[in-house]
């Protein structure tokens, strides 16, 4: 698929894709995913062509931007590494997100509390999100999926070839997809201007790591306050001047004392 020059993959985005290991696919490869393989390493890992990954990101963004109501686009992720990413995607694009376990019947049973009628769904992994894909096929909902080389592509309309098992890879794909959607909608009018949101915001973070970081920041803040208090006390308290005990007292005038007693 040829893209206009303005949609070409930039050197900065290519570096991001390589740094996040988006190009490292699975060792097993489905027949329908062979066109996305750049080469196979001696250890059996299939290297994904990031040029084709970028083309599919642009195609998916154009489909998403064509939906009149952004809330009709639902991002789904049962995989833990993708739950934070889909929530951020829905927040930035004004869409909907299903993070965590997908409740069966969400797209087919209108009695359920979580019932939705989306016009498009995006899944993080066709294997872990198979229930959402299956129900979407029943009601003719188009499906965009992040697919690895060993991922099934049944009922998937647009496959974005990438490493859908790494937390950095998943987060970066959702980040680039969000940014491209905002560019097509005109929210980011200048394609050469950098987005103020960093890719790190889409990366999965371990809850224990978050708690540890918060504790370290709290300890650092307490230490800084204690240092400030010490400085204030030192400034307020001044050491008294030392007395000169070697200095001799002025001689007493005994004549004046005798005259005073006489009076």
From Swiss-Prot:
Source organism, top-level taxon: Eukaryota
Region feature (Disordered): 211-263
Keywords: Acetylation, Cytoplasm, Ribonucleoprotein, Ribosomal protein
This protein's GO CC annotations: cytosolic small ribosomal subunit
Biased composition, class Acidic residues, residue ranges: 211-242
Pfam families: Ribosomal_S2
Single GO biological process annotation from the record: translation
Chain positions with N-acetylserine modification: 2
Subcellular location as annotated: Cytoplasm
Compositional bias segments (type: Low complexity): 246-263
A single MF term (Gene Ontology): structural constituent of ribosome
General function of this protein: Required for the assembly and/or stability of the 40S ribosomal subunit. Required for the processing of the 20S rRNA-precursor to mature 18S rRNA in a late step of the maturation of 40S ribosomal subunits.
Subunit (UniProt): Component of the small ribosomal subunit. Mature ribosomes consist of a small (40S) and a large (60S) subunit. The 40S subunit contains about 33 different proteins and 1 molecule of RNA (18S). The 60S subunit contains about 49 different proteins and 3 molecules of RNA (25S, 5.8S and 5S). Interacts with RPS21.
Family: Belongs to the universal ribosomal protein uS2 family.
Database matches in NCBIfam families: uS2_euk_arch
Protein name, as recorded: Small ribosomal subunit protein uS2
Organism: Komagataella phaffii (strain GS115 / ATCC 20864)
Chain's gene name: RPS0
